């Protein structure tokens, strides 16, 4: 991650409106990962990540920041829901599985990078295999391959292959047969399932089977096969574990749902027990995964929650201490809604315009129309539950319902969505609180 904090914020701005404080905190945390790697080895071990707690109502951009961060980080990244885990000793997923899943993500990431690195060599080897099918080498009477005298013909075919002239020609090739072993186990035993699957798949011999396919498809399959041959699995595991330990990022959503609310007591195994299990992982411990032992000392944890019923102070004091950076995300205003409808790279209005364009219908959202949509969503949020920007999805879906249904019969038309159109479509539902509670 060599992007500067300003570049990271700029990238997030293209998809998320407002919440500059949260963007800055995340950008600094990401950049600090890179800064730490530039330090001398002895000092590097002493610099631990400053974990983040994002606090804000639902629908203001907490999860979206995580999604965009995953694409930007180019590092092992996993997003989990705190409510999915149970305390050790109960049926359900244990907190350790976060690190196990993160390591699986890292193995896939490192493998894809290694395959990409070897793609040129793999491409040449795959082309040779296809040319061997198209131009079988001559053999002598004892079955030995003779020195080829058709090198010029082979070069002509290689040129055609690279130019795509042979793409639609069908050939029969030998491809590795994928051995698939399905094992059914009770919930909470996913680790045992994956170990048994690996065991049985490792015991089966490497078989090939003949398949007939177009050359362009065969080339993709063969490039992947050849690239996989050039990769050392043991080396990959070591690189993946190092990537997790030095660059891993864990995003834990809905952390407020595992808070102990007030003086509540009882056998709720998904609350305080889960917090206690999270403590050693966030503080730094060693987790045993199927790829090897992983130290969590330098993994960055970003936690988020709405904290509408519970408060951050309801978290265990030790856990609060391990989340030193607090960021509060603001509730969205009508002006924010207007910007969300128009400014992001893939804004909602753009999505609907492009969807209807596939049917030959042109949609135009006027400025006053967008303002009215934003106002309607904001009013419904005020009168009923405030679900933030997610309300725009329900309002727009209601608004576009008729157009979406009739679009295939209205090809060639231009539909202007202005203030009057929005008022006619939404006014009854927005004004009637009972209707808006159930429909919007």
Swiss-Prot record:
Major location category of this protein: cytoplasm
InterPro entries, A to Z: AAA+_ATPase, ATP-dep_Clp_protease_ClpX, ATPase_AAA_core, Clp_ATPase_C, HslU, P-loop_NTPase
Origin superkingdom: Bacteria
Record bears the keyword Cytoplasm: yes
Subcellular location: Cytoplasm
Entry's Gene Ontology molecular function annotations: ATP binding; ATP hydrolysis activity; peptidase activity; proteasome-activating activity
GO BP annotations, alphabetical order: protein unfolding; proteolysis involved in protein catabolic process
Record keywords: ATP-binding, Chaperone, Cytoplasm, Nucleotide-binding
Binding site for ATP: 17, 59-64, 253, 318, 390
Annotated Pfam families: AAA, AAA_2
Annotated GO CC locations: HslUV protease complex
Similarity section: Belongs to the ClpX chaperone family. HslU subfamily.
Quaternary structure and interacting proteins, as annotated: A double ring-shaped homohexamer of HslV is capped on each side by a ring-shaped HslU homohexamer. The assembly of the HslU/HslV complex is dependent on binding of ATP.
Protein task: ATPase subunit of a proteasome-like degradation complex; this subunit has chaperone activity. The binding of ATP and its subsequent hydrolysis by HslU are essential for unfolding of protein substrates subsequently hydrolyzed by HslV. HslU recognizes the N-terminal part of its protein substrates and unfolds these before they are guided to HslV for hydrolysis.
Protein's name according to its UniProt entry: ATP-dependent protease ATPase subunit HslU
Organism in which the protein naturally occurs: Actinobacillus pleuropneumoniae serotype 5b (strain L20)
The encoding gene: hslU
């Amino acid at each position: 991650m060599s992007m500067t904090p300003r570049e990271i914020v700029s990238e997030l701005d293209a998809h998320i409106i407002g919440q500059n404080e949260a963007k800055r905190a995340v950008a600094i945390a990401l950049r600090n990962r890179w800064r730490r790697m530039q330090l001398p080895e002895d000092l590097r071990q002493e610099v631990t990540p400053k974990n983040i707690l994002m606090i804000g109502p639902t629908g203001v951009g907490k999860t979206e920041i995580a999604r965009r961060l995953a694409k930007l980080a180019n590092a092992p990244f996993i997003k989990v829901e705190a409510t999915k885990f149970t305390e050790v000793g109960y049926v359900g997923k244990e907190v350790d599985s976060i690190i196990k899943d993160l390591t699986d993500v890292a193995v896939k990431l490192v493998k894809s990078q290694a395959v990409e690195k070897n793609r040129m060599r793999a491409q040449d080897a795959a082309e040779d295999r296809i040319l061997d099918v198209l131009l079988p080498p001559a053999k002598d009477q004892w079955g030995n391959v003779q020195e080829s005298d058709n090198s010029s013909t082979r070069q002509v075919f290689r040129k055609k292959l690279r130019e795509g002239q042979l793409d639609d020609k069908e050939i029969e090739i030998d491809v590795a047969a994928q051995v698939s072993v399905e094992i059914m186990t009770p919930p909470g035993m996913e680790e045992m399932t994956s170990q048994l699957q690996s065991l049985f798949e490792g015991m089966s011999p490497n078989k090939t089977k003949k398949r007939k396919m177009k050359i362009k498809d065969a080339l993709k399959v063969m490039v992947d096969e050849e690239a996989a041959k050039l990769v050392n699995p043991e080396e990959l595991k070591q690189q993946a574990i190092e990537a997790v330990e030095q660059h891993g990022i864990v995003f834990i959503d809905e952390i407020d749902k595992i808070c102990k609310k007030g003086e509540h007591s009882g056998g709720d195994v998904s609350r305080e027990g889960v917090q206690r299990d999270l403590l050693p992982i966030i503080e730094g411990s060693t987790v045993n995964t199927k790829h090897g032992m992983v130290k969590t000392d330098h993994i960055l944890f970003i936690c988020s929650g709405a904290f509408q019923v519970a408060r951050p102070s309801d978290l265990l004091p030790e856990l609060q201490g391990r989340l030193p950076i607090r960021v509060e995300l603001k509730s969205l205003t009508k002006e924010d809604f207007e910007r969300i409808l128009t400014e992001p790279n893939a804004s909602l209005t753009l999505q609907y315009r492009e969807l209807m364009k596939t049917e030959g219908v042109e949609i135009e959202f006027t400025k006053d129309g967008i303002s009215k949509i934003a106002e309607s969503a904001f009013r419904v949020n005020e009168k009923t539950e405030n679900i933030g920007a997610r309300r725009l999805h329900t309002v727009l879906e209601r608004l576009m319902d008729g157009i979406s249904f009739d679009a295939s019969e209205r090809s060639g038309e231009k539909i202007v969505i202005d203030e009057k159109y929005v008022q006619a479509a939404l006014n009854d539902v927005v004004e009637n609180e009972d209707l808006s509670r159930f429909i919007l």
